[in-house]
Amino acid sequence: MSEEAPVHERTFVMVKPDGVQRGLIGEIISRFEDRGLTLVGGKFTRLDTEVARDHYGEHKDKPFFDDLVSFITAGPVFAMVWEGADATRQVRSMVGETDPAESAPGTIRGDYGLDLGRNVIHASDHEDEGANEREIQLFFDESELYTYERIDDPWLYE
């Protein structure tokens, strides 16, 4: 039986203002590192309205768009780029459903999300092939991303 090798890729993740204010950045980073993903970029930033509207552009015609922009610009966020085999799919699985009430226990939103508006974290959509690259470029310059080999890589990848 032949299995196709997983795609080694980068994915964008952002701890939202509610997650930052609740001190969840370290816990979230630990979960992804424990999974074998590599943090290749991370920084605090505060989104201005223009960046927020660009980032959430696919929701611009939805009734909650203005509230979403107001929320995401209300405080600092922690933007990250993770790298690993099937990184986007792994991250989405660990993050859980958009609505924390529908997220399984053990997922980040299932454990820490309070409601649909305060769901702690954003992660690139694995169904939108261009989302990762678009979001990474919106938040990071290439010079801010560092690829390196983790000491446990030989145990994780063949």
UniProtKB/Swiss-Prot annotation:
Please give an example of a GO cellular component term from this record.
Answer: cytoplasm
PROSITE patterns the record matches: NDPK_LIKE (PS51374)
Q: Which CDD domains match?
A: NDPk_I
The protein's matches in SUPFAM superfamilies, at most eight in alphabetical order, are given as:
Nucleoside diphosphate kinase, NDK
Q: Which residues bind ATP?
A: 16, 64, 92, 98, 109, 119
Reactions that this protein is recorded to catalyse: a 2'-deoxyribonucleoside 5'-diphosphate + ATP = a 2'-deoxyribonucleoside 5'-triphosphate + ADP; a ribonucleoside 5'-diphosphate + ATP = a ribonucleoside 5'-triphosphate + ADP
Q: Which Pfam families match?
A: NDK (PF00334)
Gene Ontology biological process terms, A to Z: CTP biosynthetic process; GTP biosynthetic process; UTP biosynthetic process
Tell me the enzyme class.
Answer: transferase
Q: Where located?
A: Cytoplasm
Keyword Kinase present in the record's keywords: the answer is: yes
Q: Which cofactors does it use? A: Mg(2+)
Q: What is its EC number?
A: 2.7.4.6
Membrane-spanning segments: none
Looking at the keywords, is ATP-binding present? yes
Q: Which residues form the active site?
A: 122
Q: Which UniProt keywords apply?
A: ATP-binding, Cytoplasm, Kinase, Magnesium, Metal-binding, Nucleotide metabolism, Nucleotide-binding, Phosphoprotein, Transferase
GO molecular-function terms, A-Z: ATP binding; metal ion binding; nucleoside diphosphate kinase activity
The family annotation for this protein states: Belongs to the NDK family.
Main function: Major role in the synthesis of nucleoside triphosphates other than ATP. The ATP gamma phosphate is transferred to the NDP beta phosphate via a ping-pong mechanism, using a phosphorylated active-site intermediate.
State the name under which the record lists this protein. Nucleoside diphosphate kinase
Organism for this UniProt entry: Haloquadratum walsbyi (strain DSM 16790 / HBSQ001)
What is this protein's gene name?
Answer: ndk
